[in-house]
C-alpha cells in the first residue's frame, strides 16, 4: 500500500472539505484527527474485504476470538504505522505546520477494556493480522467503558468514561446484520411424532447491533475485524407512550440498552450479577449467530463447521457460547445431541487466566434459570451427561464427580463447562499451565490430559517499541539492522553488543532522554515534578491484594523512616511510579490506593527526604499513558505472590524497553528470567512450592513480623498514621490474615530493593542487564503466541 505525499495530501484535503467544510490550513486538530481516522479506517475496511475474499476463496479456517473486553488504546498512530503511512502523514501535516503528535493526542483511549485480559486480546488481533491468520474478535460496544479515575484526597472516585464521541470515528455500524437475543420467560419442551420442539413464552428481546473496528497487520495484507455488539430495545413502546405511561415506555428501552452501558458493572448485589450474566449471554449469543450465519452463507451446511472455524474463549465470560451453539444446532438445525456436542467439542477452545480454584466464575443457579431458561435446560442435560461420562472414568469416586460436574451447590460452574467440552484448555505461561494441571483443573487433566496446552502470552511489540520508543528503535536499527521490525527473534542479535561500551552509552543516553520526556509530560499534564536522574521504579497494573502494591508501599515507608533516622546515609534517589484502578466495589484495593497517595503526600511535604524519595500516582492509568511510561522505566515491579499471577504482559513491555524485573518467580517472570538470565533480573520471595507448604502448615503473619524490627516499625507507623489519618484497615489485614503473604516476603523484598540500589550505582553492570533484557524479549511477541495457537490449538494456516 503506497501513497505519494501528493496523493495522501489530496485524500486528507478532500476529506476535510467533504466532512468539515474546511481547508487543511484552517482545520482544527480535532477535525484533522477525525478525517485522518476516517481515511485510515476506510483503507483498512477496503483491505479487509480483499483479504476476506481471499480467505473464503481459499476455503481457509477462520478464528473467532470471544472476550469480554478488548483494551485497544488509541488506534491512529498504530494503524498508520502498520499500514506504512505514518511518515507520509507526518510529512503532509508538517507542511501545514501541524505536529502529528498533536493530532494523536486528540484521540481518546477506546473504553472497551480494563486490564491485562483486554490488552492481551487487543495484541492478539494485531498478531493475527500480521501473521495472516484470518481472525475476528467479538465483544460489546461499551458506551462508557470501565470508568475514568479521579483521585480526591487519596480516594479513588469513578466518573463516566464518555469515550464514544471521540472514538466513534473508528466504528462502522451494520444495523442490517443485527441479531435478536431473548432473555427471561419460559422455554417449554414438547415431543411430537418423535421430534423435539421448544417453544418460548413471555420472553424479553434485546437487539444486538454489530459495530466494526479494524486492526491492520504490520507488513502484511492481513486485517483483523473487531465486531462489537450494541444493545438496543426491539422497538419503542408507542402504545404505552401514547397512553401516558411514559416511564413504562422509557424504562423498557433503558433496560435493554443498559447491557452495553459499562464494562464489569459492580456485582456486589443481585441486580449487578443479573446484568453481568445478561451481558455475557448477549454478546456470546449474538456472536454465535453471526458466526453460524456467515458459515451457512458460504458453505450451506454446518456439517463442516469444525473444519472451517475455531472459536477461542478468552476466560470464562463467553462460556455461554457453548450451550448457545448447542441450542441452535438442536432446536433450529435438528441435530442429534451427540452430533451437536461433537461439533462444539471440536470448535471450542478455552484460555484460562486463573490460578486459584476459588476465583473461577460460578453463577447462582436460580439467576441462571430465570434469566436464560432454555440455556439452563441445555446446561442441565450437559451436567447429566458429564456426570455419566465421569462415572465411567472414575467409578465410585462420587466426590471427584461432584467436584468436576457442571452444576453443584446450586451453582453453574462455567469453567467446568469449558473443561468438559473444549478440545483444548491452555494456560498463559509455563508455570501457570503447570498449576492448571496440578491444582485448578487437576481432575480434568487426569480425565483428558491431551487437551491441556501452554501458550505463553505475547505483546504487540511494535506498539511498545517501534511506536513508543523511537530512540531505542533507531539505536537497534544502527546496531543490528531492521529485521527485528518484522521478526522479533532478531532482537537476539543485540546480545553480542551488551558489553560494547559505545552501545551501552547510546542505550543509557536514550533512556535518560526518555525519562526527561516523561518528566516533562508529567509536569505539563499534572504539575508534578520528578527528577529524571532518580531511579524510575514502576508498578502499573490493576490494584489488587494479590499484585501486592501494599508490599511496595511498606518498603517505601521503611525507606522513608530509614532516611529520617539516617539523613547522611548513601541513598540513590528513587521515584516510585504507581498506576492502577481498583474495582468500584473493592474496598481494600481503594484503601491501598489511599495509603499510597497519602504516603506520597507526606514524603513530598517533608524537607528531610526531598530529592531522595518520591511517589507519583498516575491518575486514570491507560494504554496511551503506558506508551509514554514504558520507554522511561528502569525497574519493573512484578511482585505478586508466587503462584497467583497467571502470566502478566506488562512485565514483557518493561523488559522490551530495557527495564530490569524486580519480581517473584511467578507467571511469565519465570520465563523472562530464563530468557535473559536470572542474574539479569532481581528475584526475591518464596517459590510456589514454598508458598503451598507454608499454607499447608498454617500461615501466621505474626511469625514474620515479631522478629523483624523494620516490619514492626513500618506497621506501627502506618497504623498510627499522621495528620489525623491512619491505615489500620490495611495493617490489621496484614497482621491477622495477610492472604497474599506480604509479611512472609517483606524481608527478602527489602533485600532485593537494597541490591537494586547497589546494581544501579554500577552503570556498566546495569546497562549490561538492561541490554540483556532487550535482546531476549523477542520470544514474548504476540506474533509468536498467535502462531503457537494456530499450530497447536486452532489448526489454522496463514493467508498471505
What positions do the PLM features span?
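A conserved ligand/cofactor-binding region detector
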Residues: 1-800
Amino acid at each position: 500500500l503506497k501513497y505519494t505525499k501528493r496523493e495522501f495530501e489530496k485524500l486528507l484535503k478532500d476529506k476535510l472539505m467533504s466532512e468539515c467544510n474546511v481547508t487543511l490550513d484552517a482545520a482544527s486538530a480535532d477535525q484533522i484527527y477525525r478525517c485522518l481516522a476516517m481515511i485510515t479506517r476506510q483503507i483498512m475496511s477496503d483491505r479487509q474485504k480483499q483479504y476476506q475474499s481471499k480467505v473464503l476463496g481459499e476455503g481457509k479456517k477462520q478464528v473467532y476470538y470471544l472476550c469480554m473486553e478488548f483494551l485497544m488504546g488509541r488506534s491512529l498512530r498504530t494503524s498508520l504505522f502498520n499500514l506504512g503511512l505514518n511518515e507520509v502523514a507526518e510529512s503532509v501535516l508538517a507542511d501545514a505546520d501541524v505536529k502529528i503528535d498533536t493530532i494523536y493526542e486528540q484521540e481518546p483511549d477506546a473504553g472497551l477494556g480494563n486490564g491485562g485480559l483486554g490488552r492481551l486480546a487487543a495484541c492478539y488481533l494485531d498478531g493475527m493480522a500480521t501473521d495472516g491468520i484470518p481472525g475476528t474478535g467479538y465483544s460489546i460496544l461499551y458506551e462508557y467503558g470501565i470508568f475514568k479515575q479521579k483521585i480526591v484526597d487519596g480516594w479513588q472516585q469513578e466518573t463516566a468514561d464518555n469515550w464514544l464521541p471521540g472514538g466513534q470515528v473508528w466504528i462502522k455500524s451494520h444495523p442490517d446484520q443485527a441479531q435478536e437475543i431473548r432473555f427471561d420467560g419460559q422455554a417449554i419442551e414438547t415431543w411430537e411424532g418423535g421430534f423435539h420442539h421448544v417453544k418460548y413464552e413471555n420472553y424479553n428481546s434485546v437487539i444486538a447491533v454489530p459495530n466494526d473496528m479494524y486492526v491492520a497487520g504490520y507488513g502484511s495484507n492481513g486485517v483483523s475485524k473487531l465486531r462489537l455488539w450494541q444493545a438496543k430495545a426491539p422497538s419503542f413502546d408507542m402504545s404505552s407512550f401514547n397512553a401516558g405511561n411514559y416511564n413504562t415506555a422509557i424504562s423498557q428501552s433503558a433496560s435493554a440498552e443498559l447491557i452495553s452501558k459499562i464494562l464489569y458493572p459492580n456485582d456486589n448485589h443481585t441486580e449487578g450479577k443479573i446484568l453481568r450474566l445478561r451481558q455475557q449471554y448477549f454478546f456470546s449469543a449474538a456472536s454465535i449467530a453471526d458466526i453460524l450465519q456467515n458459515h451457512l452463507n458460504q458453505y450451506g451446511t454446518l456439517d463442516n463447521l469444525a473444519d472451517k472455524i475455531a472459536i477461542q474463549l478468552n476466560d470464562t465470560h463467553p462460556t455461554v457460547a457453548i450451550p448457545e451453539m448447542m441450542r441452535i444446532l438442536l432446536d433450529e438445525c435438528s441435530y442429534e445431541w451427540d452430533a451437536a456436542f461433537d461439533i462444539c467439542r471440536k470448535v471450542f477452545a478455552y484460555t484460562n487466566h486463573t490460578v486459584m480454584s476459588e476465583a473461577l466464575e460460578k453463577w447462582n443457579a436460580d439467576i441462571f434459570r430465570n434469566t436464560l431458561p432454555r440455556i439452563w435446560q441445555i446446561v442441565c442435560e450437559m451436567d447429566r451427561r458429564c456426570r455419566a461420562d465421569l462415572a465411567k472414568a472414575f467409578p465410585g469416586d462420587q466426590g471427584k464427580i461432584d467436584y468436576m460436574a457442571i452444576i453443584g451447590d446450586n451453582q453453574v460452574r462455567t469453567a467446568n463447562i469449558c473443561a468438559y467440552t473444549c478440545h483444548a484448555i491452555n494456560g498463559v505461561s509455563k508455570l501457570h499451565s503447570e498449576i492448571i494441571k496440578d491444582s485448578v483443573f487437576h481432575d480434568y487433566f487426569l480425565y483428558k490430559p491431551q487437551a491441556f496446552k501452554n501458550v505463553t502470552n505475547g505483546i504487540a511489540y511494535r506498539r511498545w517499541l517501534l511506536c513508543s520508543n523511537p530512540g531505542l528503535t533507531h539505536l537497534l536499527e544502527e546496531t543490528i539492522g531492521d529485521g527485528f521490525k518484522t521478526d522479533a527473534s532478531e532482537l537476539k542479535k543485540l546480545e553480542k553488543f551488551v558489553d560494547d561500551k559505545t552501545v551501552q552509552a547510546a542505550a543509557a543516553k536514550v533512556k535518560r532522554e526518555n525519562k526527561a520526556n516523561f518528566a516533562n509530560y508529567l509536569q505539563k499534564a499534572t504539575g508534578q515534578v520528578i527528577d529524571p536522574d532518580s531511579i524510575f521504579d514502576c508498578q502499573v497494573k490493576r490494584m489488587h491484594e494479590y499484585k501486592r502494591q501494599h508490599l511496595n508501599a511498606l518498603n517505601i515507608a521503611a525507606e522513608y523512616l530509614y532516611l529520617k533516622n539516617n539523613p547522611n546515609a548513601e541513598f540513590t534517589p528513587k521515584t516510585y511510579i504507581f498506576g492502577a484502578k481498583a474495582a468500584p466495589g473493592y474496598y481494600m484495593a481503594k484503601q491501598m490506593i489511599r495509603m499510597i497517595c497519602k504516603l506520597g503526600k507526606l514524603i513530598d511535604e517533608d524537607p528531610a527526604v526531598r530529592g531522595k524519595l518520591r511517589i507519583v500516582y498516575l491518575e486514570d492509568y491507560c494504554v496511551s499513558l503506558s506508551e509514554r511510561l514504558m520507554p522511561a522505566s528502569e525497574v519493573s515491579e512484578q511482585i505478586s505472590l508466587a503462584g497467583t499471577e497467571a502470566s502478566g504482559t506488562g512485565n514483557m513491555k518493561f523488559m522490551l524497553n530495557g527495564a530490569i524485573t524486580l519480581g517473584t518467580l511467578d507467571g511469565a517472570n519465570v520465563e523472562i528470567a530464563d530468557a535473559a538470565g536470572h542474574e539479569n533480573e532481581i528475584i526475591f520471595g518464596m517459590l510456589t512450592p514454598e508458598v503451598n507448604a507454608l499454607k499447608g502448615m498454617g500461615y501466621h503473619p505474626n511469625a514474620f513480623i515479631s522478629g523483624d524490627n523494620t516490619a514492626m516499625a513500618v506497621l506501627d507507623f502506618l497504623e498510627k498514621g499522621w495528620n489525623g489519618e491512619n491505615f489500620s484497615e490495611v495493617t490489621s489485614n496484614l497482621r491477622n490474615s495477610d492472604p497474599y503473604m506480604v509479611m512472609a516476603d517483606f524481608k527478602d523484598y527489602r533485600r532485593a530493593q537494597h541490591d537494586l540500589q547497589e546494581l544501579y550505582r554500577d552503570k556498566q553492570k546495569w546497562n549490561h542487564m538492561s541490554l540483556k533484557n532487550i535482546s531476549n524479549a523477542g520470544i514474548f511477541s504476540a506474533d509468536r503466541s498467535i502462531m503457537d495457537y494456530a499450530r497447536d490449538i486452532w489448526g489454522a494456516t496463514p493467508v498471505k
